[in-house]
Amino acid sequence: MNIALIAHDNKKKMMINFTTAYELILLNHQLYATGTTGKRIMEETNLKVTRFQSGPLGGDQQIGAEIANNRMDVVIFLRDSLTAQPHEPDIQALIRLCDVHMIPVATNIATAEILIRALERGDLDWRERVKERG
């Protein structure tokens, strides 16, 4: 499955801890991330990550395009809800696209752990059938 990993600056360490803890599960999937998040994940784990632009430079929109074209299956977006983000409209658009296209999305670590366990159990295999139908 194709998994997008995004983390605001104050959540990047949490994303590194998450990807380290679940590295064995994530190794079986194609990973995509915004620029700095992807770089940090690759520096600290053995995971291969396809990187888009940094979020404020359009990375969120690039991932949104993948969602709109049915090429993303799961989005894990560790948001810093306590800090104003200059690209907040892009963030809202990304979450809206997940809702419209029925893409499971986690915006905090608790939900991310639920999604990763569901992925491990095969609970999200229905996404493959959705992609086949196009």
From Swiss-Prot:
Cysteine disulfide partners in this protein: none
Presence of the UniProt keyword Lyase in the record: yes
CDD domains hit by this protein: MGS (cd01422)
Keyword Lyase: yes
InterPro entries for this protein: Methylgl_synth (IPR004363), Methylglyoxal_synth_AS (IPR018148), MGS-like_dom (IPR011607), MGS-like_dom_sf (IPR036914)
GO molecular-function terms, A-Z: methylglyoxal synthase activity
Active-site residues (renumbered): 60 (proton donor/acceptor)
Ranges where the MGS-like domain occurs: 1-134
Chain residues that bind substrate: 8, 12, 34-37, 54-55, 87
E.C. numbers: 4.2.3.3
A GO cellular component entry from the record: cytosol
A GO biological process held by the record: methylglyoxal biosynthetic process
Keywords (A to Z) from UniProt: Lyase
Listed transmembrane segments: none
Reactions listed under catalytic activity: dihydroxyacetone phosphate = methylglyoxal + phosphate
Family indicated by similarity: Belongs to the methylglyoxal synthase family.
Function: Catalyzes the formation of methylglyoxal from dihydroxyacetone phosphate.
PANTHER family with a match to the protein in the record: METHYLGLYOXAL SYNTHASE (PTHR30492:SF0)
Protein name (Swiss-Prot/TrEMBL): Methylglyoxal synthase
Top-level taxonomy: Bacteria, Bacillati, Bacillota, Clostridia, Peptostreptococcales
